[in-house]
């Protein structure tokens, strides 16, 4: 039964995934998702925006329903059209070739004369270590003690749940 044989009322009662299946059966070729939505909207006599609430569920149904197959570039088709061996070849994305010229251009733009050479012998590591030691001496342990005073925990607080638990233990005995 073709999609055109359904009445407008029957189409509106059908699930979008069923309408899509009928469209694929009729066209016998893969269709991009947006085109599929446009065709369904025109068949139902509504604007694509009016389908907005149902689009997410429709896309989910297409993914879950075993009759449909997602091909490259948001294109969908029926699984029955593709033999099992051909599925991997059809659905694998194409890898774009990398441009080697762009990498060479970046290397040419990089001017090594702009960078200053540093001689490791000129570096005075002792001076850096002394600066770090001075910063460590500035650190005051009294500051830590003050922070610890702020964190003292009151042990006198008893949670009501603990009291209820104690009462239950006494009742059991």
Swiss-Prot record:
Disulfide bonds: none
Region described as Disordered: spans on this chain: 110-173
Keywords: DNA-directed RNA polymerase, Nucleotidyltransferase, Transcription, Transferase
GO biological process: DNA-templated transcription; regulation of DNA-templated transcription
Domain HTH HARE-type per the UniProt entry, residue ranges: 14-81
HAMAP family given in the database record: RNApol_bact_RpoE
Subunit structure: RNAP is composed of a core of 2 alpha, a beta and a beta' subunit. The core is associated with a delta subunit, and at least one of epsilon or omega. When a sigma factor is associated with the core the holoenzyme is formed, which can initiate transcription.
Similarity comment text for this entry: Belongs to the RpoE family.
Protein name (database record): DNA-directed RNA polymerase subunit delta
Organism encoding this protein: Bacillus subtilis (strain 168)
């Amino acid at each position: 039964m073709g999609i055109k044989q359904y009445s407008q009322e029957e189409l509106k009662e059908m699930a979008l995934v069923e309408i899509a299946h009928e469209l694929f059966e009729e066209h016998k070729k893969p269709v991009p998702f947006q085109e599929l939505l446009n065709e369904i909207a025109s068949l139902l006599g509504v604007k694509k925006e009016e389908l907005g609430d149902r689009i997410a569920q429709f896309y989910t149904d297409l993914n879950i329903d075993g009759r449909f197959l997602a091909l490259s570039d948001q294109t969908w088709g029926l699984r029955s059209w593709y033999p099992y061996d051909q599925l991997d070849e059809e659905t694998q994305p194409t890898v774009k070739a990398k441009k080697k010229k762009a990498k060479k251009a970046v290397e040419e733009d990089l001017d090594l004369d702009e960078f200053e050479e540093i001689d490791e012998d000129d570096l005075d590591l002792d001076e850096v270590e002394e600066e770090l030691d001075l910063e460590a001496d500035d650190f005051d342990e009294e500051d830590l003690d003050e922070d610890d005073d702020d964190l003292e925990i009151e042990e006198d607080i008893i949670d009501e749940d603990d009291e209820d638990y104690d009462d239950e233990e006494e009742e059991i005995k």
